[in-house]
């Protein structure tokens, strides 16, 4: 199927299908895009991000969103919210274009999460503990160009964090953090209302629109890893 293809973002290749660390389920590439900032009139790319969805996501999302254009999906906060909170696994591959320390990355992500939780009144001791575990997981890490942060987001609320120095996806599930709010918020920080990668959001909207409109049985149509 044409929509389920691999993508290249600033020289980083994202495979069309993978099995995430610590998972037995096949995920397809929902979309990918760059994260960057306009600095001095020039766009500087920091990371390339690929978002993968478990194949079971398509029937769930199609029930509400089939028939919508990519443009309509791209402009819908509810669509991306349904991806972040839906009852299926998600996998996020954040690959470095420029070098970054683990502390730099974790501070920025958790700062945004905590601000959001406090604003909606759900910041409790459980979230504070999860944030601390998240920071500790990243503290000793350093990410040169080409290295990756690998997040598996389970519907039960477990966030699995693994690291790769060469961009490969290992089978080691890495660090586990049991907190549903954090599991969802890490993905929302990328594709949510104030997500850091508008390019990834556009990519997901375009590709999922095509997949939902053309695929009847996703298990039959999507390629499956042996």
From Swiss-Prot:
Binding site for substrate: 47, 112, 189
Reaction(s) this enzyme catalyzes, per UniProt: a chalcone = a flavanone
Listed EC numbers: 5.5.1.6
Site, as annotated: Important for catalytic activity: 105
Involved pathway(s): Secondary metabolite biosynthesis; flavonoid biosynthesis
One GO BP annotation of this record: flavonoid biosynthetic process
Top-level EC class as recorded in UniProt: isomerase
Keywords: Flavonoid biosynthesis, Isomerase
GO molecular function: chalcone isomerase activity
Short name of any one Pfam family annotated for the protein: Chalcone
InterPro entries in UniProt: CFI, Chalcone_isomerase, Chalcone_isomerase_3-sand, Chalcone_isomerase_bundle_sf, Chalcone_isomerase_sf
Top-level division of the source organism's lineage: Eukaryota
Its biological purpose: Catalyzes the intramolecular cyclization of bicyclic chalcones into tricyclic (S)-flavanones. Responsible for the isomerization of 4,2',4',6'-tetrahydroxychalcone (also termed chalcone) into naringenin.
Record family assignment: Belongs to the chalcone isomerase family.
Note: Part of the biosynthetic pathway for all classes of flavonoids, a large class of secondary plant metabolites, many of which are brightly colored.
Protein name: Chalcone--flavanone isomerase
Species assigned in the record: Allium cepa
């Amino acid at each position: 199927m044409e929509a389920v293809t691999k993508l290249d973002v600033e020289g980083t290749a994202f495979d069309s299908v993978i099995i995430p660390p610590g998972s037995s389920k096949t995920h397809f590439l929902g979309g990918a895009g760059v994260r960057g900032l306009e600095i001095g009139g020039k766009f500087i790319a920091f990371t390339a991000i690929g978002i993968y969805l478990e194949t079971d996501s398509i029937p769930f999302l199609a029930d509400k969103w089939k028939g919508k254009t990519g443009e309509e999906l791209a402009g819908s906060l509810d669509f991306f919210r349904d991806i972040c909170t839906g009852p299926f696994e998600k996998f996020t591959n954040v690959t470095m274009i420029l070098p970054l320390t683990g502390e730099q990355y974790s501070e920025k992500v958790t700062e945004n999460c905590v601000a959001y939780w406090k604003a909606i009144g759900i910041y409790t001791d459980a979230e504070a503990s999860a944030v601390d575990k998240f920071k500790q997981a990243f503290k000793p890490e350093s990410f040169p160009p080409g290295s990756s942060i690998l997040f598996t987001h389970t519907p039960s609320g477990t966030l699995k964090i693994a690291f790769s120095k060469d961009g490969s996806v290992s089978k080691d599930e890495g660090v586990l953090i049991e907190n549903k709010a954090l599991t969802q918020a890490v993905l929302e920080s990328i594709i949510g209302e104030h997500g850091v990668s508008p390019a990834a959001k556009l990519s997901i909207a375009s590709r999922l629109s095509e997949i939902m409109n053309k695929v009847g049985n996703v298990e039959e149509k999507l390629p499956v890893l042996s």
